[in-house]
């Protein structure tokens, strides 16, 4: 059986029925690149299980040419552009510089945590729980944590892709988390003209559920806390708590001295190497 996606709606039903009947199932989904797909055997492709390819490739030297390809792709994404056969983009707002964005948001010199959301109900969020019941619950508890920490700042970047959907917005989840957002919490909505990569430049730590922005934060040297099950966690360049207790401990430790917890050169290089494998070799 060949099934697209294998996670959502009737596609998920087809996948699970075939698996329960012992029928081999191939799942696929269209990747970020034109004329290429992601492909999995007997698993949901949107799990993006890269363990096998990463284990096979991680000890092969990462060449300068490969890094240049990742850099070219990354710079295109930073500017809100497509690159070669990579045709998908989630934002078109050009960069204006981290300093200008910080001033516009009213940020000061207190440490900044950047929380980047996924789109609720997207295949990349379904069944990805580690210690929270849902992504929305994790966001709510994170907002409540920072509401009690006036010594630090939280910027929440709601996924720009929400403008293409009709479901609940993470804007509503954030606003319902506390009675009134305190001055140290700043909400950037999906339609707000703010470049996410300017926010990465401002940030001291990153907080993500499963979004690929977490990988890009690590490529920039930020310590990244991953709350959900995503393909790039567990590879030595992210913090991966297994409970809320662990999560709060990691947050407190990183926020106490974020600059001392920036990734070292080996970890940054590893993140870049992984990005090459994921963006250029994982799709077929």
Give the role of each language-model region.
Residues 102-105, 109, 149, 237, ...:
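Long, C-terminal catalytic modules of enzymes
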Residues 16-93, 250-258:
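Active-site-proximal region of nucleotide-activated glycan assembly enzymes
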Residues 79-176:
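Conserved catalytic-core segment of nucleotide-activated headgroup transferases in glycan assembly
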Residues 152, 184-186, 238:
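Short, conserved active-site loop motifs that form the nucleotide-linked donor/cofactor pocket
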Residues 10-12, 29, 192-239:
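A donor-sugar binding/catalytic signature common to diverse glycosyltransferases
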Residues 7-12, 33-36, 121-125, 161-166, ...:
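Flexible loop/turn segments at secondary-structure boundaries
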Residues 1-7:
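Short N-terminal targeting/anchoring amphipathic segment
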Residues 129-130, 166-215:
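Donor nucleotide-activated moiety binding/catalytic core segment of transferases
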